[in-house]
């Protein structure tokens, strides 16, 4: 049984995704959130763009779009999904801060924070694909993107699952100041 139709999911993604950056900017301008939180949100957006744009450019050899988007311009859907990725990233930061009782991981490498962020990113990606794959898009199974699990006839492929792990690991590599 599906909780949401493809059309309902598409409109939810469209509204939430395109409202999120505006909300963060307004909250910052009204001094309700810090510049740090605003920057973390947009860092998450840029993390999302690092795979949303390549997914779009890969085209039909990698995935198919199954539903028309309200604004049918190149990359609009992918940019909107990146705005949602920013929200997912912020939740990961919140979870790491909650479990670790500190935000030091934002300034220096912390393997526990990395684990929390990777776990959250992978779990959220799994839920997103479980609900969106086969309704909004369809990832194509091939030699470089095999199906790792099938649930109710929905084959989830490996590359979308690995994305958050690679992104978070890259983001948290220690750098010299």
Feature annotation, model-predicted:
Residues 1-4, 60-77, 137-152:
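Membrane-interface interhelical loops and short amphipathic "cap" helices
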Residues 1-17:
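Hydrophobic transmembrane alpha-helical segments in integral membrane proteins
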Residues 27-39, 102-109:
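Membrane-interface helix-boundary motifs at transmembrane edges
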Residues 43-48, 115-129:
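Hydrophobic alpha-helical membrane-insertion segments
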Residues 44-60:
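A generic, lipid-embedded transmembrane alpha helix
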Residues 79-89, 152-168:
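Hydrophobic alpha-helical transmembrane segments
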Residues 102-122:
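Internal alpha-helical transmembrane segments of multi-pass membrane proteins
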Residues 169-175:
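Conserved small/polar residues in nucleotide/adenosyl-binding loops
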């Amino acid at each position: 049984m599906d909780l949401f139709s493809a059309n309902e999911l598409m409109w939810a993604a469209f509204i939430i995704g395109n409202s999120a950056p505006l909300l963060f900017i307004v909250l910052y301008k009204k001094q309700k959130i810090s510049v740090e939180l605003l920057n973390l949100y947009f860092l998450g957006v840029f993390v999302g763009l690092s795979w949303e744009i390549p997914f779009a450019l890969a085209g039909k050899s990698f995935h198919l779009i199954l539903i028309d988007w309200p604004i049918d311009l190149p990359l609009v859907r992918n940019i909107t999904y990146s705005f949602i990725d920013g929200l997912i990233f912020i939740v990961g930061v919140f979870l790491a801060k909650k479990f670790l009782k500190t935000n030091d991981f934002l300034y220096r490498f912390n393997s526990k924070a990395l684990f929390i962020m990777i776990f959250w990113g992978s779990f959220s990606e799994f839920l997103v694909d479980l609900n969106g794959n086969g309704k909004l898009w369809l990832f194509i199974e091939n030699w470089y993107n095999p199906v790792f699990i099938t649930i109710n006839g929905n084959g989830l492929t490996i590359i979308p699952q690995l994305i958050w792990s690679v992104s978070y690991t890259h983001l948290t590599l220690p750098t010299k100041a």
